[in-house]
């Protein structure tokens, strides 16, 4: 039977990859449009959306892949090993890239244990397990809880050593956790954009993609689907 692809997802994936190339290779780093740079801290630029787009795509892909397997009668238990294996491969690919970056002067103290592929692997793993064991209503609750919990932690829990919640880079709760528990080197020295605490809202982004995938593969007509998105 011919495999039907979700063309909108293919187009969005291509758009995201093209955007990533544009952001990473603007041509002249001395003259770059502001929207092609990451915001210093507060605020949002087009560049800041690229990584969340990839995580959203991961979520949609999880729905498309494992919904079909469930419809084919494949048991959840038989899918778990493959899910863990795929996540491990993505994580190790990220580690390999980090190792190659410091290969000439390798040191574990200079090795970064986080990155984009690492985050994608974790989001994929968690989202796939959530999808196989919950419905869309529980998924919505989980995503909302992750976002709310992250926000409350950042604005209510005092950063150790400061006595009050801090939101500035390098001294907030997320940075403190990364400094306390992450081995090796962090991307920004005192904090990491793919650190431990920020993984939770990233998972919520993946779940949002799952919900979109569920909606797109539903029985509603396309006009209603577009309106619903």
Task: Please report, for each region that a protein language model flagged, where it lies by residue.
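Hydrophobic cores of alpha-helical transmembrane segments in multi-pass inner/ER membrane proteins
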Residues: 51-62, 120-132, 201-213
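A conserved active-site cap/scaffold subdomain adjacent to cofactor or substrate pockets
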Residues: 193-229
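N-terminal signal-anchor module of multipass membrane proteins
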Residues: 1-71, 75-79
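Transmembrane helix-loop junctions in multipass membrane proteins, especially transporters and channels
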Residues: 28, 68-73, 102-106, 136, ...
């Amino acid at each position: 039977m011919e495999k039907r692809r979700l063309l909108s997802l293919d187009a969005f994936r291509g758009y995201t990859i093209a955007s990533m190339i544009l952001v990473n290779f603007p041509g002249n780093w001395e003259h770059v449009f502001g929207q092609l740079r990451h915001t210093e801290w507060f605020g949002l630029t087009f560049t800041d959306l690229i990584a969340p787009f990839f995580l959203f795509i991961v979520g949609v892909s999880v729905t498309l892949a494992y919904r079909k397997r469930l419809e084919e009668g494949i048991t959840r238990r038989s899918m778990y090993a493959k899910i863990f294996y795929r996540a491990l491969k993505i994580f190790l690919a990220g580690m390999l890239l980090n190792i190659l970056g410091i290969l000439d002067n390798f040191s574990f103290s200079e090795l970064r244990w986080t990155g984009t592929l690492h985050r994608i692997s974790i989001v994929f793993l968690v989202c796939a397990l959530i999808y196989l064991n919950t419905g869309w209503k529980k998924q919505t609750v989980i995503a909302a809880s992750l976002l709310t919990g992250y926000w409350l932690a950042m604005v209510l829990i005092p950063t150790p050593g400061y006595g009050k919640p801090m939101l500035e880079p390098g001294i907030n709760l997320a940075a403190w956790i990364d400094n306390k528990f992450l081995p090796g080197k962090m991307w920004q020295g005192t904090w990491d954009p793919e650190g431990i605490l920020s993984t939770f809202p990233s998972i919520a982004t993946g779940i949002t993609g799952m919900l979109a995938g569920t909606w797109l593969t539903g029985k509603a007509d396309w006009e209603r689907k577009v309106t619903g998105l």
